[in-house]
From Swiss-Prot:
Belongs to the plant LTP family. B11E subfamily. Potential phospholipid transfer protein. Aleurone. The lineage of its organism: Eukaryota, Viridiplantae, Streptophyta, Embryophyta, Tracheophyta. The keyword Transport applies. Pfam families: Tryp_alpha_amyl. Keywords: Disulfide bond, Lipid-binding, Signal, Transport. This is Probable non-specific lipid-transfer protein.
């Protein structure tokens, strides 16, 4: 029981961190870079990126729309480790999106 509660708390903490990341990235996104980079659209991918679950169709669609922005997100020193994590790579692969080489 204690182990299940600990896992639930870690998942909640991970989701909270992801939401902070999304809000911060959204605030710092370069609005003048042609295609709109809107990291808040990647919030639907939180469970796939953080927990390794199968990405939803909406997640894959949003990743495709943000594909040109992924290197920008990877290079952000505060959040790049989320975007370049093994689960993020798995998510990209499951969505049929090439992993960027930044």
């Amino acid at each position: 029981m204690a182990m299940a509660m600990g896992m639930a708390m870690r998942k909640e903490a991970a989701v909270a961190v992801m939401m902070v990341m999304v809000v911060t990235l959204a605030a710092g996104a370069d609005a003048g870079a042609g295609a709109a980079c809107e990291p808040a659209q990647l919030a639907v991918c939180a469970s796939a990126i953080l927990g390794g679950t199968k990405p939803s169709g909406e997640c894959c669609g949003n990743l495709r729309a943000q594909q040109g922005c992924l290197c920008q997100y990877v290079k952000d020193p505060n959040y790049g480790h989320y975007v370049s994590s093994p689960h993020a790579r798995d998510t990209l692969n499951l969505c049929g999106i090439p992993v960027p080489h930044c």
